[in-house]
């Protein structure tokens, strides 16, 4: 009986690993495709069905603004020690750079103690390869570096700036856009108009840099860049983010802010749950 029970347990573990690897990892954080918290489909949420049935309309948009502001206020209320300045050659920058990937790492139960996100075992390496290829369209070193460069130099900082400066959503549209694209653009434009007087484009730094840091660690784990290169990239990302943001709380709030703009662009009405998962991860880290 004990042997049979153990076999049943082992079979269930193997079945779960095989059936969820691509489904779960293929829905993780990607540019305009995959900023979905890890393994949401494995979590039981009482309101999931109701939320996905909601029609994406102006009322839902306004409700999401309220949810965003309430969630950001929740993070603002958390205690955090005063930031300590580091010298340029301080070894603490290496740890700081790794922690920039903290929110995504927390959602995926990745290791934050060093550069490697997981143990180097075939099943985990295949999961990370699948994630990066399917969600980000990255298939090697060149693609990886191009995406990191894009996030660090343009990303949602530039996108939010363009949407904020446009006098109408039509300025951001062209003849190739279908109706869904136009609705997506209009939602993101309304978001930018709602918050442009409160948050500058630089406030998107946490959203852009956090994802770039995670890609850096994934790329290093897969051997697409060396650990020395990864440390250098994370140092550069660290210098950029501290120019724009002044605390880990603000970093987490930036992640929420950028994440909601992405959800609005995608027309994903699960945004409220998404904000909650991001806030929970940030709370754990803080």
Stretch-by-stretch model annotation:
Residues 2-227, 231, 235-286:
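Polar/charged low-complexity regulatory segments
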